[in-house]
């Protein structure tokens, strides 16, 4: 019954998102793909646990010596074209703009989302499943699975709604973490500011190597609910001269971008001072079409929905211990990639050896096998 209800819900959403009349063949294909995807989600835990409910063995070995901590920050609906660190006219990301000039910082120039919907984008970015390997979600291990198998304690801190334990693949993936901290029980219309993340950071403690995931609410619609208005509402009609469908929405989106920059700075500072992180990775699930007011609706796809920020911080200790990885990252800062390849890049950065890794899908590798002309978004649109 839950599966049937989920299929109906997904079909309803797809029909809404696709701003066109569906013909019979297309409608039948959507039904088939939705059923297969939901079946895959339903079978997700079966692949990971035996009949007694114990986790199955996963081959994964950490090559790192000592106590190394890694942080992954996941943004939401963030279009890099609205970030001053990427050349945007408004000063929306002053902190990041300064960081990009530092030797221990690398900003990737050509990162793209694999999908415009969070559920579908992150279920690939965080697992073996990608647009290129045709694996199903239920037969794909996640970054949390691999990190735990390699001896890391894992944390998931989220300012996004958890919904039900079995309602989304993101919740399924997150629930495999050793520690889960859910900070937002409301809907996307709520003003659950990302500053709620900051006091929760102190809950990550103790010795031993760790991988911490932080999932922000970021720049999700409605944009004016993503930041405290009085302090961060710095952009108005007087400081934008370009073409836009709705200037009020643009101002709110750019204000949310500025707020995101401030919150990310504070997370970075805390992580470096208190967790002594070796590496921090930031990426967004998908972009946002703000100028055309199409948000991230697949049926109205434009390039702004695909362009996302991806950047890396390396500690001095990490640079000394892994100069080859840092060099490769800098050499590849201009390569084109989609964020369903984050899984393989992060395994590389964390120094984990596992058969559940594909060097061809690691955009930080010298053996990277993709690039402009070979990449997809939404499984069909070429980049």
List PLM regions with ranges:
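A long, amphipathic alpha-helix that forms part
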Residues: 56, 199, 237-280, 312-314, ...
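Polar, surface-exposed loop/tail segments
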Residues: 326-331, 351-383
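A short beta-strand-to-alpha-helix junction
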Residues: 134-139, 247-258, 300-306, 319-346, ...
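Metal-dependent active-site segment of extracytoplasmic phospho-/sulfohydrolases and closely related
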Residues: 71, 259-298, 343
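Active-site-proximal alpha/beta segments of enzymes that process anionic O-linked groups
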Residues: 6, 10-72, 77-240, 307, ...
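Short beta-strand segments
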Residues: 156-158, 212-218, 254-257, 279-284, ...
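Histidine-centered active-site microenvironments of extracellular/periplasmic hydrolases
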Residues: 87-91, 276-277, 283-322, 359
């Amino acid at each position: 019954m839950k599966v049937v209800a989920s299929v109906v819900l997904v079909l309803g959403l797809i029909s809404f998102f696709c701003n066109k009349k569906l013909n019979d063949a297309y409608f039948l294909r959507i039904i088939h793909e939705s059923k297969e995807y939901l079946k895959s989600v339903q079978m997700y835990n079966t692949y990971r646990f035996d009949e007694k409910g114990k986790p199955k063995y996963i081959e994964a070995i950490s090559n790192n010596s000592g106590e190394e901590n890694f942080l992954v920050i996941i943004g939401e609906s963030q279009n890099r074209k609205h970030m001053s660190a990427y050349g945007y006219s408004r000063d929306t990301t002053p902190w990041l703009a300064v960081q990009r000039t530092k030797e221990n910082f690398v900003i990737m120039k050509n990162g793209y989302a694999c999908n415009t919907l969070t559920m579908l984008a992150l279920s690939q970015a965080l697992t073996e499943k990608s647009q290129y390997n045709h694996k199903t979600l239920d037969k794909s291990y996640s970054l949390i699975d691999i990190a735990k198998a390699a001896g890391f304690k894992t944390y998931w801190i989220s300012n996004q709604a958890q919904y039900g334990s079995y309602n989304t693949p993101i919740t399924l993936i997150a629930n495999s973490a050793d520690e889960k901290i859910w900070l937002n029980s409301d809907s996307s219309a709520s003003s659950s500011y990302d500053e709620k993340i900051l006091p929760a950071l102190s809950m990550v403690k103790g010795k031993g190597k760790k991988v911490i995931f932080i999932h922000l609410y970021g720049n999700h619609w409605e944009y004016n609910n993503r930041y405290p208005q009085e302090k961060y509402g710095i952009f108005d009609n007087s400081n934008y001269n370009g073409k836009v469908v709705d200037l009020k929405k643009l101002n709110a989106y750019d204000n949310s971008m500025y707020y995101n920059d401030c919150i990310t700075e504070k997370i970075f500072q805390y992580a470096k001072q208190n967790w002594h992180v070796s590496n921090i990775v930031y990426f967004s699930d998908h972009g946002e079409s703000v100028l055309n007011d199409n948000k991230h609706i697949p049926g109205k796809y434009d390039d702004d929905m695909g362009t996302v920020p991806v950047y890396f911080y390396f500690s001095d200790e990490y640079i000394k211990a892994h100069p080859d990885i840092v060099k490769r990252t800098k050499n590849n800062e201009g390569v084109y990639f989609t964020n369903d390849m984050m899984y393989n890049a992060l395994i590389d950065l964390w120094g984990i050896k596992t058969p559940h890794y594909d060097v061809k899908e690691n955009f930080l590798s010298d053996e990277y096998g993709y690039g402009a002309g070979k990449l997809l978004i939404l499984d069909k649109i070429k980049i």
